[in-house]
Amino acid sequence: MDAGSKKEDFLLLEDEKFDFDLSLSSSSTNEDDEVFFGPVGHKERCIAASLDLNRRVPGQPLAPGSGSPCTLSPLTGEKFVEVYKEAHLLALQIESHSRREVAQAATPQNPVNQGKETFVQDSQLKVSLFEKEQKRDRSPMSLKRETFCLPSSRVQPPMGEPQLLASPGLLSSPVSAGPAQTQSNQGLPCSSQPLPRESSTSQPPSQAGPQKRITSKLQPPRALPVRGRNLHLATEKLKKEVPASIQRTKLVNEKGSQSDVLQDKPSTAPDAASREGHPGKRSLPIPGKLGLKKTLLKPPGYTGNLTRKSSTSGSASSLESGVYRSSVAGKAKSSEQRSSIPASGSQRRTSTSKSGRIGPAASRQALPAAPARVFGRQANKADAAQTVAEQPKVPTLSPLTQQPQTPEQRGPRLDPDTETPQLNKTVSIKRRDSYLSCKTEAVSTTTNPFKVPQFSVGESPGGVTPKFSRTHRLQSWTPASRVVSSTPVRRSSGTTPQGLPGSMRTPLSTRRMSVLPTPASRRLSSLPLMAPQSMPRALVSPLCVPARRLSSEPRRRSTVRAELTQESSGSGSGGQAQGLSSDESSSPPSSVPQALNFSPEKSASPPPQGSSTGAAQGEAEPPEDTLPSEVHGGGCSHTPSEGLLLDLKLDQLTITPEAGGRDLADCPLIDFSNTPESNTALGPSSWPLIDLIMNTPDMGRNDVGKPAKAELGQLIDLGSPLIQLSPEADKENVDSPLLKF
């Protein structure tokens, strides 16, 4: 029964784990960290203790008389206590871990979720606030645009403008007055020079008055930016004081008569008619853009722009009213005044560009046949040409009368030079030189590439041919003078000019003719200057001497060009008989695969006879290894020493293989199809660097393979591995592998 009771006690001990938790909780909490580490260790220890107890249970009834406490106290009692402690610790740890997990799962997730929720709410609020701010920003912009377009509804010119300009106190008096009062106002600053502030307040309205009257014809909604501009000028004049005001009075006195002349030529009746009728025809955003550009691009403290704008806009209005000569005279006067102003080049450039912007805007209606963009560039060029053209008194009426006609002659074809910003300053000087030189020569030689296509535009009545054909003639000169960069087929195909000796084409002008728009054939022919395909193209035929020379040295271009021009002049009759220009004489399709022919033995065949025979082509074809100067020596024998200095032989261009081996062009780096028989038959020069078939492990590494491998001297031998795992090959692994298994 005791044993049964003990067994029941054992069973009760397993059930009493939860009962001892309350009593031993303090001690178990102290020994938590010392005794136990993980739940797996607890289970294993508990199982071991239970097994030990079960083994010792039958030994306990041997001493039943001693009593159960005696038997429990020495050994079994300690074990029971240990079992109890372990059970308590297990229960405590399991409960504590479960509670901690529950607490950690409950507590940290709630604040994180709360923070995320609050953050999302805040972000949504911020986004809504930004949207509200954007809506607030958009609404006044739309209101401003509506107010900006409002003056178009009240366009009655005599009544509308005083209403627009009555708000600033500065502009009320001069606008109501006519041009007679503007003269008196312009005369005022001379008397008020010791008072610069009064002159600064009275001077901008006097300048803005005529400008207001004239720009209202073109752009009625210009009231607000001009108003802000006058205030800006007044503040800057307060800063600059006396010397700036004196200089401005001189400018105003010089240009007062000019603006009055431009305003008095068209009568007041066409002014009113153009005021009333023009804003209906013209769209509003274009004048607004012009006004904004002028306010932004105005240099600080430079008030001459106002009178210039008034004069140019006055000439534009006179164009619309039908008086065309007055606009020419106004532009001429404005250009003269512009050239005499003591200002920097940048200010003069901005003034010419501004006048060029207003000029085509008005004259575009007079010439609707020409495209708008082309004529804008052309008129901008014309104003730039007038500024310098009137200083040496070269006749300026010829470009003024011819340039509106040149867009009709040549259509939308414009050189890319007109788009460069340098032409506002440089083209006018070159144009003046072209006026002086077009009387003597048909085409004068210059060092600047921009000047060549512009002569035909402004030539005096001697040049009758339109620019379209003349630019083609300029392009057709280049294959005769730039034969150096062309293929041998096109060497003598371009027609040389009939009455021009070779001295008139200097190397610089003809070399830089590539700035012009070139046809596709010449574009392809000029590529081998920098492309790596020029070396195989040199191997096509012995007639490709100039391309070889370009690859040898660029310093010899001038001498070769001088020689080739004489040859082309000698062979010009054959080229002219065919009548091939640079656009028509494209290289035949047979020359394209020849450029990629790498074998020098097959290139000794004669080239296709697509071009006329010149002086150099009439010679016998020399072998491939001859010098290029020998090929060229028949055409020009006066400079053989210069040709011999920097020439490259063909054997330097190609690496000559050995006599017994194959050509190196056919020798691959990695050859997958070589057999040892073919490799031994061929010389060692044609062995591949890596051979994947001869040195495979399948081929036995016997005495036959190793001397062949020594003869080859290959870089990588994939047949002998560094690590070999087969135990059968241990005898052979003594030499090659690093590790054995």
From Swiss-Prot:
It holds the Pfam family GTSE1_N. Phosphorylated in mitosis. The modification Phosphoserine is found at residues 73, 139, 153, 191, 245, 311, 460, 476, 493, 509, 514, 521, 541, 582, 599, 720, 726, 736. Induction: By p53 when exposed to different DNA damaging agents, including gamma irradiation and chemotherapeutic drugs. Coiled coil: none annotated. The keyword Phosphoprotein applies. Residues 131-147 have a biased composition (Basic and acidic residues). Residues 310-321, 360-372, 478-497, 578-593 have a biased composition (Low complexity). Keywords: Cytoplasm, Cytoskeleton, Microtubule, Phosphoprotein. The modification Phosphothreonine is found at T465, T518, T696. Residues 106-120, 173-209, 246-261, 337-355, 398-408 have a biased composition (Polar residues). Residues 101-120, 131-428, 450-512, 550-640 are annotated as: Disordered. It is found in: Cytoplasm, Cytoskeleton. GO terms for cellular component: cytoplasmic microtubule. May be involved in p53-induced cell cycle arrest in G2/M phase by interfering with microtubule rearrangements that are required to enter mitosis. Overexpression delays G2/M phase progression. This is G2 and S phase-expressed protein 1.
